A protein has these predicted regions:
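Membrane-helix and juxtamembrane interface regions of eukaryotic multi-pass membrane proteins
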Residues: 1-139, 153-243
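Juxtamembrane membrane-interface segments at transmembrane alpha-helix termini
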Residues: 145-154
C-alpha cells in the first residue's frame, strides 16, 4: 500500500475504517434525531438497522485495536525473530495480548459493554421507544475522525504541524459537545418531554438507561481529561520552546 510497511498500512487502514464508521454513525444520528418530533414515540427505520450494523463493528474494533498494538510493538523491536521456534512466537503473541489489555483495558471494557449490554438494551429492551435518543447517541461518534487523525499525525511525527493543532481544537470541541454533554442532554431532553424536573429523570428512567449512563459517562469525562492534558502539554512545550 503506497510503499508503506505492513504495520503502517495496518494502522492507517484501521484508523480510516474507524473514521468512515464514525461518519456513517453521525450521519445516521442526524437523520434519526431530525426526523423524530416526538422523542419517545416517533420511529425511524434507520435506528434498528444501524444498531445491527454497528454492533459487529465494535466487536471487530477490539481486534483492530489489538492489531495496531501488535504492529507498534513489532516496530519497537519487541517481536520475536523470524527464525526462532514456534513456541517463542506463541509467547510473543501472548505477551502482546497481555500488554494490549493492560494498555487499552478501558477501551476494551467500553466496547464489550456496548456489545453485551447496549445492543440488547437498544434493540430489544426499549421496545421501539426513544428512537430520537438513540439517534443522539449515534452522534457521539462525531469526535472519532479527529481522534483517528490525531493518532496518525503523531505516528508520522507530524504533531508540530498546523494541521495537528487545528485537529486538536476540533477534537476538543466535538468530544466535549458530543460526548461530555451527551448524557446530561439526554436527561434534559426527557425532562422537557415529560415536563418533570431534571433531577427527577433518573427516578423514572428505565434502569438500563441509568446503568448505561453511570458506566459510560465517567469514561467520557476521563478521556476528555486526558485530551485536555495532552493539549496543555503541547501548549506548554510551544511556550517554552526558543523563538
Amino acid at each position: 500500500m503506497m510503499g508503506w510497511r505492513e504495520g503502517d498500512a495496518a494502522v492507517v487502514s484501521t484508523r480510516l475504517v474507524s473514521s468512515v464508521q464514525a461518519v456513517m454513525a453521525s450521519s445516521a444520528g442526524c437523520i434519526i434525531a431530525s426526523s423524530c418530533r416526538d422523542v419517545m414515540e416517533d420511529r425511524h427505520w434507520l435506528t434498528d438497522a444501524y444498531i445491527m450494523f454497528a454492533t459487529p463493528y465494535f466487536a471487530y474494533d477490539i481486534y483492530a485495536m489489538f492489531l495496531c498494538h501488535w504492529h507498534k510493538q513489532r516496530v519497537k523491536g519487541h517481536e520475536e525473530e523470524e527464525g526462532e521456534e514456534e513456541l517463542g512466537g506463541v509467547r510473543s503473541l501472548g505477551a502482546a495480548v497481555v500488554g494490549y489489555l493492560r494498555r487499552e483495558v478501558l477501551m476494551v471494557l467500553h466496547h464489550v459493554f456496548v456489545v453485551a449490554f447496549c445492543f440488547p438494551a437498544s434493540l430489544l429492551w426499549r421496545q421501539g421507544k426513544g428512537d430520537y435518543f438513540q439517534g443522539v447517541l449515534f452522534l457521539a461518534e462525531l469526535s472519532t475522525p479527529s481522534v483517528c487523525l490525531g493518532k496518525v499525525l503523531i505516528q508520522y511525527k507530524k504533531h508540530h504541524t498546523l494541521l495537528h493543532k487545528v485537529n486538536g481544537v476540533v477534537l476538543l470541541l466535538t468530544f466535549f459537545s458530543c460526548r461530555v454533554l451527551l448524557f446530561p442532554y439526554l436527561y434534559y431532553a426527557y425532562s422537557r418531554y415529560a415536563s418533570i424536573p431534571l433531577y427527577s429523570v433518573p427516578l423514572v428512567a428505565p434502569w438500563q438507561c441509568n446503568l448505561g449512563a453511570a458506566l459510560l459517562w465517567p469514561l467520557q469525562l476521563y478521556w476528555f481529561a486526558l485530551i485536555c492534558r495532552g493539549a496543555l502539554r503541547l501548549f506548554a512545550r510551544r511556550s517554552n520552546s526558543p523563538p
